[in-house]
Curated annotation (Swiss-Prot):
PANTHER family: D-SERINE DEHYDRATASE, THREONINE DEHYDRATASE, MITOCHONDRIAL-RELATED. The keyword Repeat does not apply. GO terms for molecular function: D-serine ammonia-lyase activity; hydro-lyase activity; pyridoxal phosphate binding. Its cofactor is pyridoxal 5'-phosphate. This is D-serine dehydratase.
Length: 442
């Protein structure tokens, strides 16, 4: 972006200067509104989410047999919700900032099949596509036992079709493993920052991996192009997909059930704050949408991004959304948080969700490494760097009097609050790689 344009952008949005300087930045959204007001802008409804629930239930008998690790939950892919009191104390000590309320961790990092939040959206979209093809071919009815999809006849049928996706890693892992298991031919277009072990794991499942020297945006674009030339190839579009988004949104009702099981209350007197790592936006956007439908105006969602890849904060704050990239303002989009290394936000999620998100913040790679080490020491839980992005959120919220006043929170409401950090990945990171991460923390 030329200097004059840049200067005028900074004059209009002074916060951009801090982003350019790679400062850890917090922006509380002044335009946040009620669910009733914000919902029409999403373009999806509670019914759409219920349809996604129903589809995942239909596929549960299939998943329970296709993936032994889901048998115990009857083919439902869901993660644990755990309290992390020792980590809460450690954060308070390190940052000299009390966290009012209780700190919890949602362990999507340990979801079965692919060990990340992408096991929600990625697997869901592959299943939705497989169901559509099988229904159209008359091989399946909605009342069937879907475990019949494991038969050689279905494998043969699906092998005529292929799936393509562009990814920095975890989405590719989810879509690749699921597509290959069903019988699709599958190609994952991987950006330069994708971890070698993720590529190796995909290849071990018979997935074709195409590697690029460039970033996420290029991998997605090339994947899209390659798919266009083949009528039997379905491209899963991480930047725009409503189906992926709905796969993630199912998490809202599931979390509500987990809260009920644990006797946790969310209402006006007991607010819930949720901190979601954000790359292109589909995962956190879908989860936040589901949470809003489940908990209404009593849940407050925040997106967390690396200082080197603040695409969603930049897009929503300036109102330019996908019309601006971090590279346009001189930021390199290079971060250890490979799942969040996205320079240009989704053209769908920011516009759909901007009225329903309470805020956005950035944190440095070093902060992620530090917290990764503390969590391993204090709670014995090991995550990949990007999964720690949410962990910086509770301090930002508890330290901001202006945010608390904006929403009229009393000291008592904050004492009764639940802070939920969404851990997005790391359950499948190889030991030696994890040791390298741990060595980088202070």
């Amino acid at each position: 972006m030329e200097n004059a344009k840049m200067n005028s952008l900074i004059a209009q949005y002074p916060l951009v200067k801090d982003l350019v300087a790679l400062k850890e930045t917090t922006w509380f959204n002044p335009s946040t509104t009620s669910l009733a007001e914000g919902l029409p802008y999403v373009g999806l409804t509670e019914q759409d989410v219920q349809d996604a629930h129903a589809r995942l239930s239909r596929f549960a008998p299939y998943l329970a047999k296709a993936f032994a690790e889901t048998a115990a939950t009857g083919g439902i892919i869901e993660s644990e919700l755990v309290a992390i009191p020792a980590m809460q104390k450690r954060l308070e000590k390190e940052y000299q900032q009390p966290i009012s309320g209780q700190l919890l961790l949602k362990k999507d990092s340990h979801l079965p099949i692919s060990g990340s939040i992408k096991a929600r959206g990625g697997i869901y979209e592959v299943l939705a596509h497989a169901e559509k093809l099988a229904l159209e071919a008359g091989l399946l009815t909605l009342d069937d036992d879907y475990s019949k999809l494991l038969s050689p006849e279905f494998k043969q049928f699906f092998s005529q079709y292929s799936i393509a996706v562009g990814s920095t890693g975890n989405l590719g892992l989810s879509i690749g493993i699921m597509s290959a298991r069903i019988g699709f031919k599958v190609t994952v277009h991987m950006s330069a920052d994708a971890r070698a072990w993720k590529k190796a794991k995909l290849r071990s499942h018979g997935v074709t991996v195409v590697e690029y020297e460039q970033d996420y945006g290029v991998a997605v674009e090339e994947g899209r192009k390659a798919a266009q030339s083949d009528p039997n190839c379905f491209f899963i579009d991480d930047e725009n997909s409503r189906t992926l988004f709905l796969g993630y949104s199912v998490a809202g009702q599931r979390l509500k059930a987990q809260f009920a099981q644990q006797g946790r209350i969310v209402d006006a007197d007991n607010p819930l704050f949720v901190y979601l790592p954000c790359g292109v936006g589909g995962g956190p956007g879908g989860v936040a949408f589901g949470l809003k439908l489940a908990f209404g105006d009593h849940v407050h969602c925040f997106f967390a991004e690396p200082t080197h890849s603040p695409c969603m904060l930049l897009g929503v704050h300036t109102g330019l959304h996908d019309q601006i990239s971090v590279q346009d303002i001189g930021i390199d989009n290079l971060t250890a948080a490979d799942g969040l290394a996205v320079g240009r936000a989704s053209c769908f999620v920011g516009r759909a969700m901007e009225r329903l998100l309470d805020g956005f913040y950035t944190l440095s790679d070093q902060t992620m490494y530090d917290m990764l080490g503390w969590l391993a020491q204090e709670e014995g839980i090991r995550l990949e760097p990007s999964a720690l992005a949410g962990m910086a959120g509770p301090q930002r919220v508890c330290a901001s009097v202006s945010y608390q006043q904006m929403h009229g929170f009393s000291a008592e409401q904050l004492r009764n609050a639940t802070h939920l950090v969404w851990a997005t990945g790391g359950g499948m990171v190889p030991e030696e790689e994890m040791n390298q991460y741990l060595a980088k923390g202070r």
